[in-house]
Regions:
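Structured interface patches
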Residues: 1-179
Length: 179
């Protein structure tokens, strides 16, 4: 798996300093086999030293591929996202003793050396902008629940009016009410 690492030693040593980075990645692990990069990931990052912490802001651009939630056909989703984080050196966490440990970790990305791995930040930024349910098209008809045929490619011969045996008694009740 490719990691996105930045050398921040120059920035850490001089308050008020600023540095820009550009990285490109061809693959990324999304913790979930449902998503893969379909296009090279381009990341532009600017980090500035702001006293007790570093400010990081950036932009990413890529496309990811996954499966349609209804018909399971492969779908490519373009992704553009801005992101921002405040970075806090692990040894400086004690300076924020007035905050609970959970609050510090919520507010800051904690790092512990001059090589900053932003892979998790980028991965989370991509996943945050992806739709909950990906469709190949808005009117996707999905798969036949009986035979599994992709209904976007034509109708199947299955009788979908067959009542689930567990609901048969309700169907009979409905029929008697209609009479």
């Amino acid at each position: 798996m490719t990691t996105l690492e930045l050398d921040i030693s120059k920035i850490r040593s001089v308050k008020g300093s600023r540095e820009s980075f550009h990285r490109e990645v061809d693959d990324m692990d999304f913790w979930d086999a449902d998503w893969q990069l379909a296009k090279q990931l381009a990341v532009d990052v600017e980090i500035s030293h702001e006293g007790k912490f570093l400010n990081m802001k950036g932009h990413l651009s890529t496309a990811v591929k996954g499966n349609c939630s209804r018909c399971l056909m492969q779908v490519t989703v373009p992704v553009e996202s801005d992101f921002a984080e405040q970075l806090l050196y692990a040894k400086d966490v004690s300076l924020f003793s007035h905050l609970a440990v959970g609050e510090v970790e919520e507010k800051y990305f904690i790092y512990d050396n001059d090589t900053l791995d932003i892979t998790d930040i980028i991965r989370e930024s991509i996943l945050a902008v992806l739709p909950q349910k990906v469709l190949c098209r808005d009117d996707c008809r999905g798969l036949c629940p009986k035979c599994g045929k992709n209904l976007n490619q034509g109708q199947c011969d299955c009788d979908l009016h067959e009542v689930d045996p567990r609901l048969a008694i309700l169907a009979k009740l409905k029929e008697t009410e209609e009479v």
